[in-house]
A protein has these predicted regions:
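Acidic/histidine-rich catalytic neighborhood of metal-dependent amide-processing enzymes
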Residues: 102, 106-169, 173, 209-210
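Metal-dependent amide/peptide-bond hydrolase catalytic core
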Residues: 49, 155, 162, 169-340
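Acidic/His- and Gly-rich active-site-bordering loop/insert found
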Residues: 2-97, 303
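Short, surface-exposed alpha-helical segments at coil->helix boundaries
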Residues: 30-34, 105, 251-255
Length: 340
């Protein structure tokens, strides 16, 4: 029997494991979306699917007679590869997505059910594609219910994020001229040009912020060349900058640094975001990006959730059971404060 063939386990640990055992690598979220839609409907929610692409659908659920909840809990259903099933020990739940972000889905559902017993209605928004391009969030942004606050879940160790760094993905392309490697003077090495361009970018002084920290650069991939005995005519690198403010100056500096060596094309930008905080709660800076910049029509954003980003996407991904339980309490506390 597949995990999606049975009903919700409303214990947060059991529900986390049940969700982890439904493989939902980005692009393959159909099964978990169908499961969440069916089970939330069974619990009495007015659940609907928002088609993002083909059979990939967001799930948005509200309580009957509460189609415009002031507070919406949200996170994503997709995970990075590879899939591995759930397991647990005395203190942790393991498995792909346990931390990022199926433990968060479980915590939000259990919190919503607890709030329901206290006559407090919140919405639930579960999205596809966050790990790839935030497609689900972009689609959802055109279908906002008019909520005032969006409590987005990502692994923050249950601390409120003061800000979330943005992202600037840049593709560098260098071109040269092929020649026999015995006669390099007859060609022009695209790889040499790319390496020089990368050296210049690495030497650039990047901005920093006293509260948020530094803008950072990761050279993620490098490829080029045809054979060891051929002067390469093309080389390419993919870079990712973590933004702490506007990208305008950085874009100009990148273009200037690589001028004459390579072209720099921006393939993705997610803006830096400052977030709403809650008095008295511990805070952190999210050095990663989230769906929040693509959900601008869903109200003032907050970012908080169980789990550590340092174990997300790893071969031993896990979430602490204690943090899952604490997250349920925390989501309830924040929602009550925002609706008081």
């Amino acid at each position: 029997m597949r995990p999606s063939d049975v009903s919700f386990h409303m214990d947060v640990v059991s529900l986390t494991r049940q969700l982890v055992d439904i493989e939902s690598i980005s692009g393959n979220e159909a099964e978990i979306g169908n499961f969440l839609h069916a089970e939330l409907s069974r619990l009495g929610y007015a659940a609907k699917k928002m088609v993002a692409e083909s059979d990939r659908c967001n799930v948005f659920a509200t309580l009957p007679n509460s189609s415009t909840p002031p507070v919406v809990f949200s996170t994503h259903m997709d995970t990075v590869p590879p899939f591995f099933a759930s397991s647990e020990d005395a203190t942790r739940v393991y498995g792909r997505g346990s931390c990022d972000a199926k433990g968060i889905i479980a915590s939000q559902i259990v919190a919503a059910e607890r709030l329901r017993t206290e006559s407090i209605a919140v919405g639930l928004l579960f999205l596809v594609g966050e790990e790839r391009d935030s497609l689900g969030a972009k689609v959802a942004n055109h279908q906002s219910p008019g909520s005032k606050f969006l409590i987005n879940g990502e692994p923050t160790e249950n601390r409120i994020a003061v800000a979330s760094k943005g992202a600037l993905r840049v593709e560098l392309t260098a071109t040269g001229r092929m020649a026999h490697s015995a006669y390099p003077e007859l060609g022009e090495s695209a790889i040499d040009k790319l390496l020089e361009a990368l050296a210049r970018l690495r030497a650039m002084k990047l901005p920093t912020d006293e509260e948020v920290g530094p803008c950072t650069l990761n050279i993620g991939t490098i490829e080029g060349g045809r054979a060891p005995n051929v002067i390469p005519d093309k080389a390419r690198a993919q870079l990712l900058y973590r933004l702490i403010g506007s990208s305008e100056n950085l874009r100009a500096e990148i273009a200037d640094a690589v001028s004459g060596l390579a072209t720099a094309d921006v393939t993705l930008e997610i803006p830096f975001t400052r977030l709403r905080t809650v008095n008295g709660m511990p805070t952190m800076i999210a050095a990663y990006t989230t769906d929040i910049p693509s959900l601008t029509n869903w109200g003032q954003p907050l970012l908080v959730g169980p789990g550590s980003i340092h174990v997300a996407h790893t071969e031993g991904e896990y979430v602490e059971k204690k943090e899952l339980s604490e997250a349920v309490d925390l989501y309830c506390e924040i929602a009550k404060g925002l609706t008081a």
